[in-house]
């Protein structure tokens, strides 16, 4: 239990984490007395999932998965449990499992929340029009903040930054004063849009607003670190990354810190962070997890510049979810491996999606140049600069 004097010193993130831990402990104690209580078992699964999304701890996600599986085994495929399992599987890129999860409960695919997941699934699988139309239909039925944010994300990826920002603003309008973590997350996404356009001060302002709305959240601080690095404040950014990693040792953050050190000309400082990141990625893959395939592709393509290894991971990722992101990742890996014709083919597929992003266009420019198509290369360099005239500044591959 947190006393009032201690609570006053804790951040919003710490307070929520403590409340969640207390809820979990209370539910676990109660279930030891009444293990057949379906309502409490379901609430426990949801609170465990909430804690895992706060901390992004692999152990917390594993605990959540174990409780969900045990509850479904004990009580059968209840809708709320299957919906939670679908959310968990989607987060870890187990997309085939998402369909199975939703179909375990016959009426579940028609539920509003399940239709949102199916729209997300369509986007991840390259069915962009279906995803957009489903988001729009869901918003017509019920103007929820999360579906407005989903549609905003879609338009941001497709290059309409103005519409994306307006939709995020509308999402904020749907939130109440009790939903400050959600508000801060939406502010964070608006900052991400600013970063993608090279508007670093605007992004930093958004991130500061997010931090004021919900203090102490490592996710916000990680984005603040990127904004600092993009603005040339490298040592300040590196210090903040180290602080975030000390609390949330995610391998993608370790890789980012290593890349920042390389950008600063301090390759010796980078290597230990790269080794830690790669070890975690590979350990995850050995356990049968698939959600780091994209990171392994990026790591081998850009950190190690090992095109053959990058292409191997890229193909595995693409088998799970073929979309412009995985197509472009394979194209870049093939480029690194000197397979220019194949690289050009996959990049053409990625570009045909309509996605518009400075990094995508910069990579396209390099591939077209290698293929001897200099005019196309220049055109894509121009498109990259039109989106973000400061693309050469430090940025995170997301």
Regions from the PLM with identified roles:
Residues 1-80, 91, 100, 388-398:
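N-terminal leader/linker segments that initiate helical-solenoid repeat arrays
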Residues 43, 84, 117-118, 150, ...:
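Canonical tetratricopeptide repeat
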Residues 46, 53, 87, 120, ...:
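Residue-level recognition of tetratricopeptide repeat
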Residues 20, 54, 61, 95, ...:
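TPR-repeat structural position
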Residues 51, 55-58, 92, 125, ...:
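Structural motif corresponding to the intra-repeat A-B loop/turn of tetratricopeptide repeats
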């Amino acid at each position: 239990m947190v006393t009032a004097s201690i609570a006053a010193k804790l951040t919003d993130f710490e307070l929520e984490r403590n409340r969640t831990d207390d809820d979990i402990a209370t539910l676990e104690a109660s279930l030891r007395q009444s293990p057949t209580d379906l309502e409490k078992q379901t609430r426990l699964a949801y609170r465990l999932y909430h804690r895992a999304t706060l901390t992004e701890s692999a152990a917390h996600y594993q605990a959540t998965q174990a409780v969900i599986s045990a509850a479904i085994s004990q009580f059968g495929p209840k809708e709320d449990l299957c919906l939670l399992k679908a959310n968990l599987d989607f987060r870890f890129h187990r997309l085939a499992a998402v369909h199975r999860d939703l179909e375990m409960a016959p009426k579940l695919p028609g539920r509003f929340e399940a239709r949102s997941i199916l729209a997300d699934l369509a986007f991840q699988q390259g069915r962009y029009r279906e995803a957009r139309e489903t988001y729009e239909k869901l918003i017509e039925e019920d103007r929820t903040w999360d579906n407005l944010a989903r549609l905003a994300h879609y338009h941001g990826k497709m290059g309409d930054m103005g519409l994306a920002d307006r939709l995020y603003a509308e999402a904020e309008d749907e939130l109440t004063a009790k939903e400050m973590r959600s508000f801060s997350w939406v502010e964070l996404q608006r900052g991400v849009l600013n970063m993608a356009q090279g508007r670093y001060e605007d992004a930093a302002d958004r991130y500061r607003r997010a931090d004021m709305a919900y203090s102490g959240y490592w996710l916000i601080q990680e984005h603040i670190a990127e904004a600092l690095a993009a603005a040339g404040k490298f040592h300040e950014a590196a210090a903040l990354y180290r602080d975030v990693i000390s609390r949330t040792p995610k391998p993608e953050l370790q890789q980012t810190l290593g890349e920042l050190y390389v950008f600063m000309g301090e390759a010796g400082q980078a290597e230990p962070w790269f080794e830690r990141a790669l070890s975690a990625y590979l350990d995850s893959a050995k356990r049968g997890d698939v959600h780091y395939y994209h990171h392994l592709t990026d790591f081998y393509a850009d950190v190690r510049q090992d095109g053959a290894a990058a292409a191997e991971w890229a193909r595995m990722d693409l088998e799970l979810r073929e979309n412009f992101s995985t197509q472009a990742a394979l194209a870049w890996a093939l480029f690194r491996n000197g397979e220019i014709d194949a690289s050009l083919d996959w990049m053409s597929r990625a570009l045909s999606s309509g996605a518009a992003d400075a990094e995508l266009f910069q990579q396209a420019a390099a591939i077209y140049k290698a293929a001897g198509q200099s005019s196309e290369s220049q055109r894509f360099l121009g498109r990259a600069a039109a989106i973000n005239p400061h693309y050469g500044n430090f940025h995170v591959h997301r």
